[in-house]
């Protein structure tokens, strides 16, 4: 692995945390999830949005990403972390893996989550994803389409592509 930090980006619910944990285990490195870091320090994301608003959440997210990428390992970001230009520039020192999807399986993945930006469910998810997709694509060193493969095969593809990027 050429760069010491692998950062997983992509839309909410695509599997960044699930794949990230397994990837970190396979690479024998630490795993950090920026959403979990925010929750541990500041409380539930939904409550942060309700009490402090999205701009404050995004500021907390910038801090979490900066902290997470300061040490070697695998990092899963929140879906909107890439909205920050500061975060975008910081990701330049990492290997960015974009987990893409066509959205066909997202309804079941999103059904069991409390996501403050998805008041209208899958329609909101699609709109947000289309808005962010160009940013995900521009930041990616590696793109993995998760639509037609299992998490295990996506993980194998990431490991193979990371080895090729060395």
Regions found by a protein language model. Give the residues of each.
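Post-Walker A helix-loop "phosphate-sensing" segment adjacent to the P-loop in P-loop NTPases
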Residues: 25-34
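Hydrophobic anchor at the beta1->P-loop junction of P-loop NTPases
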Residues: 8
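P-loop (Walker A) phosphate-binding loop of NTP-binding proteins
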Residues: 11
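A glycine- and Lys/Arg-enriched "phosphate-lid" helix/loop adjacent to the NTP-binding pocket
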Residues: 93-135
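NTP-dependent small-molecule kinase module
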Residues: 1-2, 18, 22, 26, ...
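ATP-dependent small-molecule kinase phosphotransfer cores
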Residues: 33-81, 85-89
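Conserved glycine(s) of the Walker
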Residues: 15
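Short glycine-rich anion-binding loops that position phosphate/pyrophosphate groups of nucleotides
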Residues: 79-82, 102-104, 149
